[in-house]
């Protein structure tokens, strides 16, 4: 019977599964967007939301608890300094899952899992790229094409 059993096994041992999700949470927080299979993304959403909620508390004990799942100190600092401030007003639901189709090799359903408020970090880069394109000199107009004439038939030799 499957009473009170929470989570997916994903055909892995307990140690492999926990290590995989710790690595995936770290990657998600570092890059703020990763591509994975849909069942892994759904399970990762639970892990990531718990870690971000701990970071919002901001206490030393919360940092120790988050350090169990996020072993990279650089990512842990990013979580507590920038991401906790970004999600301070949001009561939950820090991640979004978008299905992107199927993988070519094994036809597994793939999804993108990303942090919800990642637009502020990407907006300045997009504006800079737009300004660079506008600064380029306009291209010269193309010369009009010559009219096409039918090819002359070769004169028959008599």
Curated annotation (Swiss-Prot):
SUPFAM superfamilies from the UniProt entry: Prokaryotic ribosomal protein L17
Entry's Gene Ontology cellular component terms: cytosolic large ribosomal subunit
Bias (Basic and acidic residues): 126-158
PROSITE patterns: RIBOSOMAL_L17 (PS01167)
Superkingdom of origin organism: Bacteria
Region described as Disordered: spans on this chain: 119-158
Matches recorded under InterPro entries: Ribosomal_bL17, Ribosomal_bL17_CS, Ribosomal_bL17_sf
UniProt GO BP: translation
GO molecular function terms listed in the Swiss-Prot or TrEMBL record: structural constituent of ribosome
Keywords: Ribonucleoprotein, Ribosomal protein
A Pfam family per the record: Ribosomal_L17
Membership in a protein family: Belongs to the bacterial ribosomal protein bL17 family.
PANTHER family membership: LARGE RIBOSOMAL SUBUNIT PROTEIN BL17M, RIBOSOMAL PROTEIN L17
HAMAP family, sorted: Ribosomal_bL17
Subunit-structure text: Part of the 50S ribosomal subunit. Contacts protein L32.
NCBIfam families: L17 (TIGR00059)
Name under which the protein is recorded: Large ribosomal subunit protein bL17
Organism: Anaeromyxobacter sp. (strain K)
Phylogenetic classification of the source organism: Bacteria, Pseudomonadati, Myxococcota, Myxococcia, Myxococcales
Gene: rplQ
